[in-house]
Amino acid sequence: MAEPTSTLSTATPAAPRISFVSLGCPKALVDSERIVTRLRAEGYELTRNHDGADLVIVNTCGFLDSAKAESLSAIGEALAENGKVVVTGCMGAEPEQIRAVHPSVLAITGPQQYESVLDAVHQAVPPKHDPFLDLVPEQGVKLTPRHYAYLKISEGCNNRCTFCIIPKLRGDLVSRPLNEVMREAEKLVAAGVKELLVISQDTSAYGVDLKYAESRWKDRDWATRFFDLADALGDLGAWVRLHYVYPYPHVDRVMELMASGKVLPYLDIPFQHASPTVLRRMKRPAAQEKTLARVLAWRDAVPDITLRSTFIVGFPGETEEEFQELLDFLDEAQLDRVGCFKFEPVAGAPANALENPVPDEVKAERYDRFMLKQQAISARRLKRKVGTRQQVIIDSVTPGGAIGRTKGDAPEIDGSVKIASRRPLRVGEIATVKIEAADAYDLIGSAVGF
């Protein structure tokens, strides 16, 4: 877990100390930030050491068996080092699985149950709060570095993909009103955040549940809609990066915001597959047969757009012909950044009941072929950047330079730029870098313009 960015530790020496472990996706990280912010507001101090804490909170992931194993391991480690552990998050929706392995945990709550987490903490370690001494930053306590932040715009999902249990864990789509999201975003930017990463389970469905109701922001009524939110965020002066976007037709409108520079020319779109028959078995939303045409149209509208996606190979019933359709799609779409997963059954997912499961050795072979093809595509696309000048946000400083990311790279999941510089660069600074070399995933360059 990253060090919380609140450096104001003015609580009394006797303030209870909480150690926090956050596992899983960025949506879970935002949940962790909300809990941590409430704890700091109540006078609790945060520590990274379990053995020096009065209590440990573990925010779990329960999407895949491997994630559950990691969560159970983290709980066991916390129990061994501390003994007082509160468990929350997606795996908390199945408390019997946790109790079977770790019966001594103090409490288990499901995802988004912030009040239940706080109640459990209060019972185990009552707060010692002095509102005149304790101070929490207005933007809340963040678990990311200071210069970027995840902005969660909704909870839950209305889709019913057969490989996924997110609706079971987190419920149907619940969008936050646009003015509420904008107030949070404005506070983050005022606190020094240079990059806002917009996240949800289905970002392009934002506002559907509210029937796109209008809300007041900056003397104007804005619809609670994907395009309107992106447009409003683009006025804040920070990089705006859009994640978990489904290829619905209305996403086309966002191209004008990218072309004008209001939001980054970047889309994270979880295609998952390209074969129409596999997609039907997956029950994926959107008109997938038009996806390739849409990708090509986006590239025409915004030539420098970066498209990232994730795919699943070895889905039940996947034939060699269907897998070849996926490889052909990679050739035609020429995506910039791609992740791939071998299908893994998730307890409670309808896909588990589908016929003709793919043998593990076939999954592994297809995964290797997929990654080899995409690696070559990514390398060719990055090579095009050699000789160009790119705006790069600095993530860390190194002797004689820094490590950063272009507008086409999200933190943690995409590539980076290794930068040589004659002057010191600062974390969070946006520098102009001349790209001098590239490999399959990363760039090398020199800072210019000084």
Swiss-Prot record:
As its record notes, the protein acts as a catalyst of:
L-aspartate(89)-[ribosomal protein uS12]-hydrogen + (sulfur carrier)-SH + AH2 + 2 S-adenosyl-L-methionine = 3-methylsulfanyl-L-aspartate(89)-[ribosomal protein uS12]-hydrogen + (sulfur carrier)-H + 5'-deoxyadenosine + L-methionine + A + S-adenosyl-L-homocysteine + 2 H(+)
Binding positions for [4Fe-4S] cluster 2?
Answer: C157, C161, C164
Q: Which segments constitute the TRAM domain? A: 383-449
- Sequence ranges assigned to domain MTTase N-terminal in this UniProt record: 16-126
Annotated GO molecular function terms are:
4 iron, 4 sulfur cluster binding; aspartic acid methylthiotransferase activity; metal ion binding; protein methylthiotransferase activity
* Cofactor field: [4Fe-4S] cluster
Q: What class of enzyme is it?
A: transferase
Enzyme Commission number: 2.8.4.4
- Describe cofactor binding as the record notes it: Binds 2 [4Fe-4S] clusters. One cluster is coordinated with 3 cysteines and an exchangeable S-adenosyl-L-methionine.
Q: Name one GO cellular component term.
A: cytosol
Alphabetical UniProt keywords: 4Fe-4S, Cytoplasm, Iron, Iron-sulfur, Metal-binding, S-adenosyl-L-methionine, Transferase
The lineage's top-level taxon is Bacteria
Question: Which family would the database say this protein is a member of?
Answer: Belongs to the methylthiotransferase family. RimO subfamily.
Described by its record, this protein's role is as follows: Catalyzes the methylthiolation of an aspartic acid residue of ribosomal protein uS12.
Can you say what this protein is called? Ribosomal protein uS12 methylthiotransferase RimO
Q: What organism is the protein native to?
A: Azorhizobium caulinodans (strain ATCC 43989 / DSM 5975 / JCM 20966 / LMG 6465 / NBRC 14845 / NCIMB 13405 / ORS 571)
What gene does the UniProt entry assign to this protein?
Answer: rimO
